[in-house]
Structures are given as structure tokens and as C-alpha cells.
Amino acid sequence: MAIALIATFAYLLGWSQIFTVKTIEVLGSPNALSEVDILKMSQVKIGGQLARVNTQATKENIQEIRWVRDVDISRNWIDGKVQLSVLARDPIAYFNIDQVEGQTIDNQGELFVLPGFSNPELPVISAATSAGALEANDLFTAFPADFRRSITSMVATASSSFLLNAKLKGRNIKIRWGDSAEMNLKISVIDRLLALPENKKITLIDLLAPHAPIVR
């Protein structure tokens, strides 16, 4: 009797049309285009058996999408709903878009292209070499959030040397940043220089020697 009940239950879960996927819901997807990516990578199909939806495998499939930061999968045995909840990465800058169209980075330094995403207010980071790109990425994501938001573009001009364009106190300022050392000191120097009345018309700050900055 017990064996028969187990066999019947196994049949209902694995083969019967009672416990099938009736709806698939995507939560947290930034837009319709990115939702298509989620559905495709999940490999979950309407009409498929709920018992055969491997939540761990589905999660791993979706996490292959670069713009996905985290994902959670759930099944509802009563209404047949499979819910795909994703946490998308938040772009903080465009990165080498001349090489990869629409490529962005987040505050963890991850590179990704978010389908359908466009934000002309995001800064643009450029680097000629892969090493320069990694260093630019590390420096940019290490900046304090308020200073990072002031940057409109960033270029790795040479090995460990960077040029910034920023909007500071309502002014467009070009900053020869130098290497990534003494970040807090350099930001403090910028603030002090811009506060001086005699510097109200400057457009360039050279921080190659932060203890002896040059303004023009």
C-alpha cells in the first residue's frame, strides 16, 4: 500500500499535468529587454513539470548573465507559478564603450552590458591597455561616492596615470590626477584650491605632485 502511494505521488509530481508550470514571473528585471534574458537563461518552460525545475541549476544559469548580481528561485505548488527574483547590478559609469558598446561597471568593479540601458549622465572611463583599464576601474570605484558623482570622464593616459574631467562647484575642471596614491589628500587639495577666491577662474588642477599642486 505504501509503495503504491509513493509511486502515485511520484507520478503526480513528475508526470501528471496537475503539477506543471503555469506561469513564470520575473521580479527585479530593470526593463523588458533584460527580462527576456532572464527567461531565456532560466530554461523554465510553461507546461513543464514543477518537480523538474531544478532551482539551483536555474539560479546558476541566470547568474551567468553579467548584469545579474543575485537571484532567487521559488516554486508555488498550488498555483504552478515559478518566480525568478533578480537583483540587477547598478551601473556607476560607462567603461571603454569604444571597444564594447554600452559596457558599464558597478561599484564592485564588475563589467557588464545591461540591455536597453541608457544614462547620458553617467561618466565615461577609457583606457588604452587592459592593465590601465583595471587600474582605472579600481581607482574610480574606490573614490568616495560624492566625488565619484562629480566625474564626467576619466582616461588612463599612461601606466598608473589618470586624467579626470569633473563638474565641481558648478565648474568644469580638468584634473591631472597622476597615480592612484594619496587619494584622500588629492581630494582635500582640490577642495581647498577651489575654495580660494583667486582660483575662481581656473580650469585645470595638476596633482602630479599633490603637496605642490599647479592650477591654470
Q: Residue spans of the language-model regions?
A:
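Short helix-loop capping/hinge motifs at secondary-structure junctions, enriched
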Residues: 31-33
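Charged, solvent-exposed interaction patches on well-folded alpha/beta domains
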Residues: 1-14, 19-22, 35-36, 40-49, ...
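Glycine-centered tight turns that cap/initiate beta-strands
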Residues: 67-70
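Extended, alpha-helix-rich binding/interface surfaces that flank or overlap catalytic cores
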Residues: 26
